[in-house]
A protein has these predicted regions:
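Beta-strand-loop-alpha-helix segment that lines the small-molecule cofactor/substrate pocket
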Residues: 138, 144-145, 149-197, 211
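Predominantly a Rossmann-like dinucleotide-binding segment in NAD(P)-dependent oxidoreductases
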Residues: 185-190, 195-306
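Bacterial N-terminal signal peptides
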Residues: 8-16
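Bacterial N-terminal signal peptides that target proteins for export
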Residues: 1-7
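C-terminal helical cap and adjacent loop that interface with cofactors, partners, or active-site loops
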Residues: 22-42, 46-50, 55-56, 78-79, ...
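Glycine-rich phosphate/pyrophosphate-binding beta-alpha loops
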Residues: 326-337
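A structured beta-alpha segment of the ubiquitous adenosine-cofactor-binding alpha/beta core
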Residues: 118-137
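N-terminal Rossmann-like dinucleotide-binding module
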Residues: 19-113
Length: 510
């Protein structure tokens, strides 16, 4: 009997029938094709349609004035409208929300800035009429998650540039459609990832780009934010909607559904699709406890299935052998935390929960800062005096330009204003945007890829290549800048336009 069992096991191992998954192509509920290959889930990268070209480094003709239409004026949209009234050379042409009164309410920001009223659109499909206008250059989307894609698709199909709040796409199908629409129409499709513009992240990115940490080989990011005070405030579609759109989405979907705050800044530091690419991930989550309780509390019914775990962890390995860890937790009580940690061969940076840098004396000197203590080492964070000197030396040029005004205008401490200002700056100067459609797709696809991993025993899953082989075309992530002369010229035109627009509106109201 033992001999028979051993023979059977040997045959199984020889032919792989006991351990190998079927290699037939499978399709999940979102339409994604995938198959097993040596224990790894391989996700198909579709071929680029004929006549379509990459938009890496896409630069469009300069826009003296950026004419904007805003769609989605609930929690985040009004703040964006307000911020744009502070940016010279912009014109808020149209406002749109499902609920008309929300759009009308945002007229107050224009009035306070002495700017003319904007056209108002509302209803389920109001954004379609906005996108058809021929006097809009940019559609700024801040709706609930499920409307990000349809609004962006409509805008791109109507020849508009788009900027989309996070997460900008909810699955791979949407990611690929946005990539193809951007490439086909030669228009910008930017993810509005504000955390890439926070002070620590920008200064640390500048340090990394100047070799302060040596080669960055590992990075961490997260979105850990107990949303208990906010669940009741998310938009609800009618009286029958007891959960609100965000809790409902978490209930129905597994994976890191809000990865971009953590992933975006570290992806820039690791030069993703600028010399490296994310290749493989493995995801794991805890069971849902708080999520189920929230459904029971808000819907007054027992929740038997809550797909999103209370805490999700995703591990990613890149083509160049770097590792990224991303976490998501909006359920349990703990301090706000985006982690943001870079581990380099010669130094270390960490934002949450303790902010600081760790370098030894030799590396600090090599980075252009003279240590004040003789025995400085990397076993702990550097003293405050050295920290201040290091940050001062490597203060990011974008922070020097916009930092002080950003603190006055606000928006998550000012980073939202910096993000919007850079978007307008690049459009006015005909430059590539700081984040392109490939960033959008790479950062947003973690949700579905993580779901694939966890639904298949936490298996390894390959990333599709949204650049379709061009991830190594550019070496190193960089922000684009105009020359001083070009910058001064575009700013003069912007200020002149805004001044005349306000004067015309004041005269009209007299």
């Amino acid at each position: 009997m033992k001999i028979t069992n051993f023979l059977a096991l040997g045959i199984c191992l020889l032919f792989g029938s006991c351990t190998m998954q079927k290699s037939t192509v499978q399709v999940n509920d979102k339409g994604t094709e995938w198959e097993w290959n040596k224990g790894t889930i391989v996700v198909k990268t579709p071929e680029r349609p004929a006549g379509q070209e990459s938009v890496i480094g896409l630069a469009l003709p300069k826009m003296e004035v950026v004419r904007v239409g805003f769609v989605g004026l609930g929690m985040r949209g009004p703040g964006a409208v307000s911020r744009f009234t502070y940016i010279p050379g912009t014109q808020i042409v149209a406002l749109c929300d499902y609920e008309k009164e929300r759009a009308e309410k945002c007229q107050k920001y224009l009035k306070e800035a002495s700017l003319p009223k904007a056209a108002v659109y509302s209803g389920e499909k109001g954004y379609e009429e906005l996108c058809k206008r021929d006097d809009i250059d940019l559609v700024y989307i801040a709706t609930d998650w499920l409307h990000h894609f349809p609004v962006a698709k409509c805008a791109l199909e109507n020849g508009k540039n788009v900027a989309i709040e996070v997460p900008s796409a909810m699955n791979l199908k949407e990611c690929w459609e946005l990539v193809d629409l951007s490439e086909k129409n030669r228009k910008h499709c930017m993810i509005l990832e504000n955390c890439c513009y926070d002070w620590f992240e920008m200064n640390t990115l500048n340090m990394a780009q100047h070799g302060v940490f040596g080669e960055v080989i590992r990075a961490q990011g997260a979105y850990i934010h107990n949303l208990a005070p906010f669940w009741k405030h998310y938009w609800k579609k009618g009286e029958d909607d007891k959960l609100g759109w965000r809790l409902d989405y978490n209930m129905r979907h597994r994976g890191d559904v809000y990865a971009t705050h953590g992933l975006g800044p570290v992806a820039q530091a690791l030069n993703i699709h600028r010399g490296d690419r994310m290749e493989t991930l493995v995801a794991m989550d805890t069971k849902s406890v708080v999520g189920k309780d929230l459904v029971k509390e808000n819907a007054d019914s027992v929740c038997n299935s809550f797909r999103n775990g209370d805490h999700t962890t995703t591990l990613i390995r890149t083509a160049n052998g770097k590792v990224i860890e991303i976490q998501h937790n909006v359920m349990t009580p703990q301090p706000y935390n985006r982690l943001y940690q870079l581990t380099g061969t010669k130094g270390f940076a960490n934002k949450y929960p303790t902010q600081g840098y760790a370098l030894d004396a030799e590396q600090l000197k090599a980075s252009g800062v003279q240590p004040k203590v003789d025995d400085l080492n990397s076993h702990g964070f550097m003293p405050r005096e050295e920290l201040v000197a290091l940050v001062e030396k490597y203060q990011h040029p974008i922070l020097k330009k916009y930092g002080e005004m950003a603190k006055e205008v606000g928006g998550h401490g000012g980073m939202d204003f910096i993000m919007d200002s850079r978007l307008v700056y690049c459009l006015q100067n005909g430059l590539p945007l700081d984040m392109d459609v490939y960033d959008l797709a790479e950062w947003c696809c973690l949700a579905e890829l993580g779901e694939l991993s966890m639904d298949n025993g936490c298996a390894a899953v390959t990333f599709p290549d949204f650049t379709r082989g061009e991830w190594n075309k550019i070496q190193g992530y960089k922000h684009a800048y105009a020359t001083q002369e070009e910058e001064a010229n575009s700013m003069e035109k912007a200020k002149t336009f805004t001044k005349k627009l306000k004067e015309k509106n004041r005269n009209k109201l007299r």
